[in-house]
């Protein structure tokens, strides 16, 4: 059943493991992996921090929406989105309608541990990053849940084990949706 999967889109906060899990999942599925932030960087020739500095968050979000639109139309990929991709209503629609969305749900403590020394995250280059992460989590968690077909807690197990769990959930999801979509027989 997993061969019949549409594209798989990973959403969640920064530090949730979207890139790590996405790479491993793509390898297991025999698919291409794309990180939307890397895609934006390759399209613009500039890194995310530079785009934020020159165009502000609004400029970056416009680029992100174009990228999400393009990438969600590619067949059978595994896509890791940026943490704020769900803020735009059109991105949420693209994700929900064009593939299976997995929400990697990482508690703020896990996010802090994974992003503490990362200087490439513009939103955290301010005093009190924990407060910023808590605010982002509170604002975005309902949106991640809105688009998610599958919710997977992160930070409590090894990435390879998580991928195995996701493969089982994806297989179950495919079975349940194919049964639901079959016409009823009289």
From Swiss-Prot:
Q: Keywords, A to Z?
A: Amino-acid biosynthesis, Aromatic amino acid biosynthesis, ATP-binding, Cytoplasm, Kinase, Magnesium, Metal-binding, Nucleotide-binding, Transferase
Could you state one GO biological process linked to this protein? amino acid biosynthetic process
GO cellular component terms, alphabetically, are: cytosol
Broad class of enzyme this protein falls into: transferase
The molecular function GO annotations come to:
ATP binding; magnesium ion binding; shikimate kinase activity
Please give the Gene3D superfamilies that the UniProt record associates with this protein. Answer: P-loop containing nucleotide triphosphate hydrolases (3.40.50.300)
Q: How is the cofactor bound, in the record's words?
A: Binds 1 Mg(2+) ion per subunit.
Pathway it belongs to? Metabolic intermediate biosynthesis; chorismate biosynthesis; chorismate from D-erythrose 4-phosphate and phosphoenolpyruvate: step 5/7
Q: Please give the Pfam families that the UniProt record associates with this protein.
A: SKI
Write out the residues that bind substrate: 37, 61, 83, 140
Q: Which cofactor does it need?
A: Mg(2+)
Record: residues binding Mg(2+) = 19
Against PROSITE patterns, the record matches this protein to:
SHIKIMATE_KINASE (PS01128)
Q: Which EC numbers does the record give?
A: 2.7.1.71
* Xref: InterPro entries: P-loop_NTPase, Shikimate/glucono_kinase, Shikimate_kinase/TSH1, Shikimate_kinase_CS
Q: Which residues bind ATP?
A: 15-20, 121
How is the subunit organization of this protein annotated in UniProt? Monomer.
Q: Which HAMAP family match?
A: Shikimate_kinase
Among PANTHER family, the record links this protein to:
SHIKIMATE KINASE, SHIKIMATE KINASE 2
**Stated family:** Belongs to the shikimate kinase family.
Q: Protein name, please? A: Shikimate kinase
- Gene (UniProt): aroK
């Amino acid at each position: 059943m997993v061969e019949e999967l549409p594209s798989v889109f990973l959403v969640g906060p920064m530090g949730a493991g979207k890139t790590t899990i996405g790479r491993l999942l793509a390898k297991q599925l025999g698919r291409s992996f794309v990180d939307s932030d890397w895609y934006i960087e390759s399209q613009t020739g500039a890194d995310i921090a530079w785009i934020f500095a020159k165009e502000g968050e609004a400029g970056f979000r416009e680029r992100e929406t174009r990228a999400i639109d393009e990438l969600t139309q590619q067949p059978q990929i595994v896509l890791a989105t940026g943490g704020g991709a769900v803020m735009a209503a059109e991105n949420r629609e693209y994700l929900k309608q064009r593939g299976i969305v997995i929400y990697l749900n990482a508690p703020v403590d896990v996010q802090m541990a994974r992003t503490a020394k990362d200087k490439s995250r513009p939103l955290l280059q301010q005093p009190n990053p924990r407060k910023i992460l808590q605010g982002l989590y509170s604002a975005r968690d309902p949106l991640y849940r809105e688009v998610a077909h599958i919710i997977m807690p992160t930070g409590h197990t090894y990435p390879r084990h998580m991928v195995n769990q996701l493969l089982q959930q994806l297989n179950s999801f495919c079975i349940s949706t194919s049964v639901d979509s079959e016409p009823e027989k009289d």
